[in-house]
Amino acid sequence: MLFNKEEYKQRLKKVQKMMQDKGIELLISHDTNNLNYLTGYDAWSFYYAQCAIVHVNAEEPLCFVRAQDAGGAYIKSYLKKENVIVYDENYIHTWPRHPYDYLVEIIKERKWDKLSIGLEMDSHYFTAFCYEKIKQGLPNATLKDSDRLVNWTRLVKSETEIGYMKSAALISEVGMKKAMEVINPG
């Protein structure tokens, strides 16, 4: 992990505070950058259903991934094993079955199905079909757009994040100086 567990916990607290301010009790974050920001998970498997699920009072988010990606989630995230929720490959390309059928089951099992649920309605990989699965599966929930809640949280950088950004800038500077020394016309 690039960041320590405390960094992720601080991020979670900031997100939960914004959730409270917006009246969101459960957040389903589909944006791959936000999934990484909240959990540390960074696999390139965003082309199929995966998300972070944040309860407003939880100590950790949940990381919802397909079975073939579970190993990466266990290794790359800071989460306890029980907070990595793995759905079976039988949910992949078996129309009309969909991974969000299982997501809905998880939400119901945890008795979160009557909460105010924030969804990233403008996330690239949150399709209309995903939305319909949640809407139909959780008829007693109040669904609302989270208005890029996590994205807005990410704007204010921690000292650790700023440190990484400064290091990256220095590396870029050294690389560009070297490029300028060796570059020639033609």
Positions of predicted regions on the chain:
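A composition/biophysics-driven feature that prefers long, compositionally simple stretches
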Residues: 1-174
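C-terminal helix-coil-helix/basic helical segment that borders enzyme active sites and/or dimer interfaces
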Residues: 177-186
